[in-house]
Amino acid sequence: MERYKALEQLLTELDDFLKVLDQENLSSAAVLKKSGLSELLRLYTKSSSSDEEYIYMNKVSVNGEQNSASPDKVPEEQGPLTNGEPSQHSSAPQKSLPDLPPPKMIPERKQPTVPKIESPEGYYEEAEPFDRSINEDGEAVSSSYESYDEDENSKGKAAPYQWPSPEASIELMRDARICAFLWRKKWLGQWAKQLCVIRDTRLLCYKSSKDHSPQLDVNLRGSSVVHKEKQVRKKGHKLKITPMNADVIVLGLQSKDQAEQWLRVIQEVSGLPSEGASEGNQYTPDAQRLNCQKPDIAEKYLSAAEYGITINGHPEIPETKDVKKKCSAGLKLSNLMNLGRKKSTSLEPPERSLETSSYLNVLVNSQWKSRWCFVRDSHLHFYQDRNRSKVAQQPLSLVGCDVLPDPSPDHLYSFRILHNGEELAKLEAKSSEEMGHWLGLLLSESGSKTDPEELTYDYVDAERVSCIVSAAKTSLLLMQRKFSEPNTYIDGLPSRDCQDDLYDDVEVSELIAVVEPAEEAAPAVDANSGSEPDRVYLDLTPVKSFLHSSSEAQAQASLPAVPHQDDVAETLTVDPKPGTTPEEPHTESPGDPEVQQRQPEVQESSEPIEPTPRITMVKLQAEQQRISFPANCPDTMASAPIAASPPVKEKLRVTSAEIKLGKNRTEAEVKRYTEEKERLERSKEEIRGHLAQLRREKRELKETLLRCTDKGVLAKLEQTLKKIDEECRMEESRRVDLELSIMEVKDNLKKAEAGPVTLGTTVDTTHLDNMSPRPQPKAATPNPPPDSTPVNSASVLKNRPLSVMVTGKGTVLQKAKEWEKKGAS
């Protein structure tokens, strides 16, 4: 009996010693020996248990008074029984026992649960392992058909690590750094237990220990690895391995010690500096970020519980899943809905519009936390999630703030927001492109005049700096265009101070003024009729020299030289004479002293009464009317409103002149913008060709660098590579500016092709005065009101207030732009 007790104690001590060795860093030979001892100990323990059960079921009672003992009275652990003489205290039979069958290699399992009647297929849903991460509901479509023949039912009673069995091929473990049976996550969210071996720099995964060809063979050189820990019943530790040129690999481990051991081995193989085993620490080279960008895009805005631990270093507590969901068979309706939703979001265009919100890591109380950041109205808002249901912290005002990159080895794409030298927030992006995008957004909202190229980037890689600067400039320019895009209803309105510059670059058409012959003029209007004279519109084309008459003396000095004839180019309203009817207007020449005295009186009386912009317009037009034309000009004649004859011919001729003027202006603008567009397109093609050539030279230079061994030549090649990188950045910047210029020229070309009237704005004719005179009582004041001054019809149309305008399709375009702005915000 002492021998059996010593043997039992030896087995216990050996088991404890093997557990201690699990926490040590052993060589490959020691690992193999330890795994062999663990397997032998497990086999001996199982075989002794099976022998005990067999003997217990077949034992006989020596005394008739003794009955079979119940199972509860028999101790669970007994030493192996040997044949001997029967005694009163021995329950073994007298004769030798038959040869026992070899114990089966079946690991212990708990009592199987009886499947429910309503879900006969629940057995497949309960296959080990069942749990999934929170965001994997829509991915569990298959039922793991290929893993039915695997050992998936082993529980925690066995050894902490399941090592390869003795019948496994020794070649699988030869020269292996580490090997064990681990869970490997497949592409549909399934988990399969496979034999994972790290040999040299490669990770090999076998379906079973008897296979000779691996299911997965990946080179771990240059790969990154992240350790994640979750408080769940199974697979509480995961390793996410991101190789250089392969898909992401997720391994499930049973304990933290095993996870740390595998993490240390993988980091040694990958050649990356050790980051420790703490959760959330990871080191991802920039080249790997560029190569493995595609598989990570779909996970960009998913929960961090899928493949990574929380940013603040605390393990996440998964949501409690419904028990009914585990027992039911097949794919749930919620899974189908989630699956469709994920597919629809992945098919959306990545750059639907200028994105002003995304997930960023925010430093809060010395801990990094993931927050949904949103920029609006020069404020940076922080939310717990993208639904904006809960505010994480108070909004941050960006006005007057500075944005500075602040990279570190652990956080490559972090940047700070400062106000008067005081740090307000520290943020971190997920990639160089996203960092540049947010730098441009924040610089635009803060009102800073700093160019993204002027910021200090502490990066060695020139491509990374170029990517950040390019993304920052793009988002900065897009923000400027978004909030300063042209408004066709307020942009380009003529200034009141420079009315003369509107048509300076357009060929002046012939001046047409139609007037009735002098002999057909009616007598003067009756002075007692009391009718107020109507406003008279002279269809004169404005010329630059007309409006640049600086003084009234110069304008009046030219009046005596004008002969008293009917072919003068000015028509004024005159006080009606007695004895005439209101329907008979009278035309006086500008040579009459009454007319010459009345014009200064109108100007002098109008200026102190209404010092408004309208007076300036009337004065300017009054100066414009004092223009003399030579008597031998056949096309220049004085015009007066005639009620007796229809003015159809006059209107047609005036309209044709104005249309000709607008047509000439439109053709000139269309031609100019078309030439500008063609020139920019040619420059764009040249820049593209130059960029392609530079990139080709850069690629060839990199290949030469890889093959070169001479240090002197290597330094020269690196210097040349830096110059080519700088040229690429400059050409890319020129290309971006050129693209924006082309877009602006195209918009101007469309406006020019639409015609002289901006965006279909029409003039309401009901607000315009009729050309025919109407009988009205004469004003009591001797001086006529300022409105009686003759004005130019073209100038009046241009200076008419916006309230007179009737917007047709322009209203539709304006509303469409407002809706677009609302949708973008």
From Swiss-Prot:
Residues annotated with Phosphoserine modification: S408, S484
Alphabetized GO MF terms: protein tyrosine kinase activator activity; SH2 domain binding; SH3 domain binding
Keyword Repeat: yes
Region (Disordered): 62-163, 571-614, 757-801
Subcellular location(s) per record: Cytoplasm
Residue(s) carrying Phosphotyrosine: Y56, Y413
InterPro entries: AFAP (IPR030113), PH-like_dom_sf (IPR011993), PH_domain (IPR001849)
GO cellular component, one term: cytosol
Polar residues bias (residue ranges): 80-94, 759-769
Processing after translation: Tyrosine phosphorylated (by SRC).
Positions of modified residues (Phosphothreonine): T113
Keywords: Coiled coil, Cytoplasm, Phosphoprotein, Repeat
Coiled-coil intervals, chain numbering: 657-754
Feature: compositional bias, Low complexity: 593-608
Gene Ontology process terms (BP): inflammatory response; positive regulation of DNA-templated transcription; positive regulation of epidermal growth factor receptor signaling pathway; positive regulation of interleukin-8 production; regulation of interleukin-6 production; regulation of mitotic cell cycle
Domain PH residues, every copy: 175-271, 353-447
Subunit structure: Interacts with SRC. Interacts with LCK when tyrosine phosphorylated.
Function statement: May play a role in a signaling cascade by enhancing the kinase activity of SRC. Contributes to SRC-regulated transcription activation.
Annotated protein name in UniProt: Actin filament-associated protein 1-like 2
Lineage: Eukaryota, Metazoa, Chordata, Craniata, Vertebrata
Gene from which this protein is expressed: Afap1l2
